[in-house]
Amino acid sequence: MTAALGTKGMKAIACDVRRALTGRWFWAALLATTAALYLSIGQAADALMEDAENFWFTLSDLLLMALRGDFGLLTLPALSALPFAAQALHEIKCGAVRSAVFRAGRRMWILGKAAGCTVSGMVLQAAAAGLLGLILYAVRGGNILLEINAEFNLTLLRRMLCGGIWASVGCVMALATETSSAAYLGPLCLCYALMMLGKRFFPAAVMLNPINWIDGGDGMLAGLESVSILLQIVFLKRGVREYV
């Protein structure tokens, strides 16, 4: 019986992750994130479209510009939270949480929502980078050096961690305020607030500014990811306890 319950619980978690990665909001966020990354390339994108003869960028060069571009980084918090950050609050408010907890158990419902939110934020960033790479390759008709180096892989990993962090923060803010819009606006406002603090008041604290997370601080990002997931679980427990 315990094994059956465990299997049912794991299926519930997998179901939440699948819903997070296949829902319409994930696809909307994927298109928006890809567009933001493309706009972050700037003048290199113009040269790409004009098919300039002296175009010398490799695929890694272009994707690194996209991943580190200000526009892509400024939109990252809200877009990362878009696919699934408000889902837990929605289920709690509409009463669907009762039947979900009855089927899978409270613990598995909580883990499913936390996993779906975090994984969707991370996968979104990787998928957008992959889609942009395909678009850039297609625009050049295959006439581009397909060089993917270690620097790109590390930068993409950092961006994925940022996506997971902001998605978790969005879920926490939505549950804390009991407002769905806080899932998207909350991470964006927090990001801008930290940017202002870092630039104006604590310039020496480089990693206080989220824009700089993409350039380093791997251990810090892993720690923030862990803390954000734990906070998410705490608020999910509180939310489900009040309504179930």
Regions found by a protein language model. Name each.
Residues 19, 89, 101, 174-175:
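Helix-capping/transition residues at the boundaries of transmembrane alpha-helices
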Residues 25, 105-107, 111, 179-184:
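Membrane-helix interface segments
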Residues 26, 34-86, 111-177, 213-223:
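Secretory targeting signals
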Residues 86-119:
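Helix-loop-helix units of permease transmembrane domains in multi-pass membrane transporters
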Residues 198-219:
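Extracellular/periplasmic helix-loop-helix junctions in multi-pass membrane proteins
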